[in-house]
Each structure stands twice: as C-alpha cells, then as structure tokens.
Amino acid sequence: GKAFERSAPCGPVLPVSSLGDPFEGNLSLTVNGETRQTGNLNQMIWKVPEMISYLSEYFELAAGDIIQSGTPSGVGAVEKGDIMIMTVDGVGSLQVNVV
C-alpha cells in the first residue's frame, strides 16, 4: 500500500519563481542506480493549472498544500534496502532509502 506513516516524502518547498517553466522539465527515477522511469512535465495529461482549478471545486486549497499526481511508465515494486532517487531538471533531486 501507499498510505502509511512517513510514506510521502517531499523535498524542500521552493518559490515558483525559482523553478523556471512549470510545464517543461525532464524527470527520472533511479532505483539502486538503475533508471526505472523517465518522462517530461510536458507529457502530463492534466497541467498544473487544470488540476488546481478542478480540485479547488471540491477542496479548499491553501498555500503550502501539495497536490500529488501520476507518474511516468515504469512503476515497479521496491524492497527494503533499495535507494530511490527522483530528479526533476531545474528543481533538484530527492533520495529515499527504503526501510
């Protein structure tokens, strides 16, 4: 399952002005150094403004809220001891050690 204590790690909050184009940027996920997922933000079915517009019809969104969306193809299981590194060009990387 995806929903358990400390199961949604995220990196530092950055001002939008420091990120460049929010609709363009390569992203990748490696597991133990092996590339598992690659994609680009321009491949998202729903763009960020569309997601915000839709969700705000049902939920009150506030500064600091996080909206999680889908992921590129290549989803697979991970195991205890695996090291996952997610990178988004122009934003940075986040490393997660599976425990």
List the predicted regions and their residue ranges.
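Catalytic-pocket segment enriched in acidic/His residues
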Residues: 1-99
